[in-house]
């Protein structure tokens, strides 16, 4: 309604003291070693990325990178939806606590500690993080928080966060402070890529026509659209 600005809403604390007192988070204090040369941290997430679309055919670049990295195959997601999954990723808790944390103003321990250790925190979301209110629940104390990315389409916005981050790396890499970066891609969630990007998996729908979905339809074109979106995110 224009009564309160979106920036003020993100910073707003409802001061629900009872709610905060009921939350025993974290149960134990975090124990860590402070290094003279702290590591930079880059967290990249693809919204709605299904594990079945993680292979050499669909995500060759990510698969190649994963071959030389640690892979945690026993971890469970806190949800099969965007809101709950990102909540669990940062809080390491079930998404059942979403409402409690939303009104309490308590931030993820990860973000709190990064700020204490003087990390430069950069958030690069393709879709807005105002709704769902990730900006408020996860990053309300992060200075100069980026809550959205300009672009007419999901593809445009995904490309934009990549370009913006690569440009920012020139400054981040030459700075004296360590940095934490979170890039959140939306192509696999948006089911939308330009027609000339649909060549990898055919036949493919050009867009997700959910009205056509039923128990009798051949799902191949729909799945191929999804695979094309994930493959484009990988590229």
Which sequence ranges carry the predicted segments?
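Metal-dependent active-site segment of extracytoplasmic phospho-/sulfohydrolases and closely related
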Residues: 42-43, 225-235
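Short glycine/proline- and acidic residue-enriched helix-loop micro-motifs
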Residues: 215-227
């Amino acid at each position: 309604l224009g009564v309160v600005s979106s920036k003020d809403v993100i910073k707003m604390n409802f001061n629900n003291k009872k709610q905060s007192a009921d939350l025993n988070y974290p149960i134990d204090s975090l124990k860590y070693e402070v290094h003279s040369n702290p590591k930079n941290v880059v967290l990249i997430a693809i919204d709605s990325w299904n594990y079945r679309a993680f292979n050499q055919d669909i995500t060759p670049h990510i698969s190649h990178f994963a071959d030389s990295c640690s892979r945690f195959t026993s971890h469970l997601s806190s949800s099969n939806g965007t809101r709950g999954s990102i909540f669990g990723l940062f809080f390491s808790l079930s998404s059942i606590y979403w409402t409690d944390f939303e009104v309490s103003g308590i931030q993820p321990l990860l973000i709190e500690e990064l700020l204490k250790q003087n990390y430069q925190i950069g958030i690069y979301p393709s879709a807005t993080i105002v709704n769902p209110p990730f900006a408020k629940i996860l990053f309300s104390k992060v200075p100069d928080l980026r809550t959205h990315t300009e672009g007419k389409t999901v593809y445009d916005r995904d490309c934009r966060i990549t370009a913006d981050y690569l440009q920012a790396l020139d400054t981040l890499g030459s700075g004296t402070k360590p940095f934490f970066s979170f890039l959140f891609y939306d192509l696999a969630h948006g089911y939308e890529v330009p027609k000339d990007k649909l060549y990898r998996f055919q036949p493919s729908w050009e867009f997700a026509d959910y009205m056509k979905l039923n128990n009798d339809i051949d799902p191949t074109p729909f799945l191929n659209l999804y695979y094309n979106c994930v493959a484009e995110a990988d590229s």
